[in-house]
Amino acid sequence: MANFTAADVKELRDRLGAGMMDSKNALVEADGDIEKAIEILRLKGQKGNAKRGDRSTAEGLVAASTQDGAATLIELACETDFVAKNDKFIALSESVLAAVVAAGASTVEEALQAPAGEQTVDQLISDQAAILGEKIALRRVARLAGEHQEVYLHRTSKDLPPQVGVVVDYSGTDAETARSIAQHIAFANPEYLAREDVPADKVEAERAIVTEISRNEGKPEAALPKIIEGRLTGFFKQVALLEQDYAKDNKQSVKKVVEAAGLTVTGFARFKVGA
């Protein structure tokens, strides 16, 4: 005769989100000891997670929060869009984000060790991965803590949670323009804030490429410097936020838009699921 009750099964399911039969079997194996049953389920979950270790996690969601003068952005990855839109996965992302924010974590390593109730974020993710049957990973974390922050989350499909997330750090008072800049970043995907932030070796590599292209096109040698600089300007427009044409008015650069609004963008982070 089983030495546990339906209430024990319910408690185990509520605490771990495990299935009915998994909970019953764990309680049988644990002789009715709930804490031991939890350890049994977690151990089985860890073994399952190990088997899933090499699987690709190209789906998931981004989530963000602004609190106490800082903005935090995370990407939580899974294997399929079916799990990405699952209520348990979305609830997990909310719990992970709350724990990361509370800990002030700014890296994945710090975030995984952040307390999440009676366990760490790493353990919380591991438990839910076992329940959902997919590899789940906290892929990226960013934390910005300047004067002001603005957040923008974008859905690429109405059936899925946000797939693109942006946080912007800025000084100034025009929050509406700051949010518009966050939307621009989501659309234009700059890699750097200003042209001065682009690594010198990357600039020189691009210079070598456009020089070779220009010469192969038979451009006059005397005209090459001007042509090369023009093409480098196009390169900076691709990779540097302030050099880009503003998405809502391509007759203006982002730099001119923020200057006109009295803003100074001091940093940003952009995550796209799977990218």
Swiss-Prot record:
Residues 80-83 are annotated as: Involved in Mg(2+) ion dislocation from EF-Tu. GO terms for cellular component: cytoplasm. Keywords: Cytoplasm, Elongation factor, Protein biosynthesis. It is found in: Cytoplasm. The keyword Nucleotidyltransferase does not apply. InterPro entries: EF-Ts_dimer_sf, Transl_elong_EFTs/EF1B, Transl_elong_EFTs/EF1B_dimer, UBA-like_sf. It comes from the Bacteria. Gene3D superfamilies: 1.10.286.20, DNA helicase RuvA subunit, C-terminal domain (1.10.8.10), Elongation factor Ts, dimerisation domain (3.30.479.20). Belongs to the EF-Ts family. Associates with the EF-Tu.GDP complex and induces the exchange of GDP to GTP. It remains bound to the aminoacyl-tRNA.EF-Tu.GTP complex up to the GTP hydrolysis stage on the ribosome. This is Elongation factor Ts. The gene is tsf.
